[in-house]
């Protein structure tokens, strides 16, 4: 066969192979991953004991017991561990600069990203500062801490409209109301125009006032509004706005929400709260006030949807202690709500699926379900135990954090665990291997005198 003919046949064979590859569902896909043997807290469908999760192309494909695992699969043995969806941080502070788009300012190599993974957080609401004098503004997004992977970091943008109308700045509130009324009037005129246009095609559309796009999104309920309010009076003022303009509202803070829980529930307003936030009661009024450890439980009883965040909700939660053993992480604040009477299931939902619902990303994250993103964490114990570490964190099916390989946390262990390659802890030394006097001292006995 001559050279030109050989090249032609080689081209034909290559094209056929390419067509077969495109037609095959397996071609170009990642190898299947199986997380096997753990107790799976699905959040929405109970707990699967000694279960297996099959992951392919970043998605959960199957969940159950005794699943057939392909021989070439990447098997992660997590026997004796707790497996649950990655945590969802429904609010953060100082996570993004004041840019028009969060996507333009993301840094996948930021130290905070690795700390989020170590804390088991796989979805994070971030916000930038709005322009001074604007009652609505500031970029918002939901991101994933995909360390080193910029392409898969952004989950949703925009995610909400920030309301900058603090109770002590009456002008901001007045400006917000005026803009909302302008937007409401424009929508009324637009509806009238659409009806009349069928009879008169030459009719001119109403002129849209400037700077009302954000307000239109609120009135059309395309985007929720987020407003910081802690005291009962602040919360009630926010609810008055919902009465006049029926937009979707999320209250951040809600320290005294327990005192007006029924009013919040009646307007279908969500709350993002910190169970351990402290606020002294107002001694100048006769009504209940101040913080209450039963805040979350009271809101649950009233039918209010809420998410839980730490009192200091920085991008990576906080590093006041060690991630995974830090008393300021999401599970510890959820545990504080349980101590106030909230049931464990609702507390888990408040840091996973309910938080995802409030952020509008529950179709992808927040629970372990077939078809959802494989954002999964593996814990060394019960999520609400103070001594539990995050051991593995998967984002989009990829292992993003392994505690045993972490430069920050590999050496940190429970008191009864040995550290590979490290000298034994002083509490793990066999007393019989110690000199007699040292053994007696540790046993609380009086050492034998030396003659």
In which residue ranges do the predicted regions lie?
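Bacterial N-terminal signal peptides
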Residues: 11-23
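His/Asp/Glu-enriched, well-ordered alpha-helical/loop segment
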Residues: 99-100, 224, 265, 274-277, ...
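Extracellular/periplasmic ectodomains of large secreted or surface enzymes and adhesion receptors
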Residues: 30, 308-317, 321, 394-451
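Divalent-metal coordination cores built from histidine and acidic residues
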Residues: 30, 77-203, 303, 439, ...
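Bacterial N-terminal signal peptides that target proteins for export
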Residues: 1-14
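C-terminal cap of metal-dependent C-N hydrolases
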Residues: 38-41, 369-413
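Histidine/acidic residue-rich metal-binding segments in metalloenzymes
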Residues: 175, 179-250, 255-271, 290-303, ...
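Histidine-rich, glycine-flanked metal-binding segment
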Residues: 40, 44-84
């Amino acid at each position: 066969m001559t050279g030109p003919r050989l090249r032609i046949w080689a081209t034909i064979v290559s094209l056929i192979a390419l067509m077969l590859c495109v037609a095959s569902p397996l071609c170009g896909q990642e190898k299947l991953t199986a997380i096997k043997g753990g107790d799976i807290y699905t959040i929405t469908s109970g707990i699967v004991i000694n279960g297996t999760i099959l992951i392919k192309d970043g998605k959960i494909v199957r969940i159950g017991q005794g699943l057939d695992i392909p021989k070439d699969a990447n098997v992660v043995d997590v026997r004796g561990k707790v497996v649950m969806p990655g945590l969802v941080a429904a609010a953060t502070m100082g996570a993004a600069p004041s840019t028009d788009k969060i996507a333009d300012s993301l840094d996948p190599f930021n130290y905070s990203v690795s700390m989020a993974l170590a804390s088991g957080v796989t979805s994070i609401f971030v916000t930038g500062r709005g322009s001074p004098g604007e009652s609505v503004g500031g970029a918002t997004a939901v991101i994933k801490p995909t360390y080193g992977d910029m392409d898969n970091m952004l989950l949703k943008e925009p995610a909400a409209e920030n309301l900058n109308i603090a109770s002590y700045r009456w002008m901001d509130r007045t400006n917000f109301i005026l803009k909302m009324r302008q937007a409401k009037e424009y929508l009324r005129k637009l509806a009238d125009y659409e009806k009349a246009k069928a009879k008169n095609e030459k009719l001119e559309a109403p002129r849209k006032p400037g700077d009302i796009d954000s307000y239109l999104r609120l009135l059309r309920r395309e985007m929720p509004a987020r407003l910081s309010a802690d005291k009962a009076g602040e919360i009630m003022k926010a609810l008055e706005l919902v009465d006049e303009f029926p937009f979707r509202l999320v209250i951040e803070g809600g320290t005294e929400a327990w005192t007006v829980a029924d009013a919040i529930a009646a307007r279908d307003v969500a709350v993002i709260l910190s169970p351990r936030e402290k606020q002294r009661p107002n001694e100048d009024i006769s009504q209940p006030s101040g913080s209450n450890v039963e805040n979350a439980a009271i809101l649950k009883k009233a039918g209010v949807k809420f998410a839980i965040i730490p009192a200091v909700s920085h991008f990576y939660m906080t590093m006041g202690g060690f991630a995974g053993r830090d008393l300021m992480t999401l599970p510890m604040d959820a545990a504080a709500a349980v101590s106030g009477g909230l049931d464990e299931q609702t507390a888990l939902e408040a840091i996973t699926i309910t938080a995802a619902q409030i952020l509008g990303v529950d179709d992808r994250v927040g629970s372990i379900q077939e078809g959802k993103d494989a954002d999964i964490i593996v814990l060394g114990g019960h999520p609400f135990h103070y001594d539990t570490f995050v051991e593995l964190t998967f984002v989009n099916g990829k292992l993003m954090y392994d505690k045993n390989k972490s430069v920050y946390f590999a050496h940190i262990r429970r008191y009864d665990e040995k550290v590979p390659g490290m000298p034994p802890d002083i509490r793990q030394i066999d007393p019989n291997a110690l000199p007699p006097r040292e053994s007696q001292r540790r046993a609380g006995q009086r050492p034998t005198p030396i003659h």
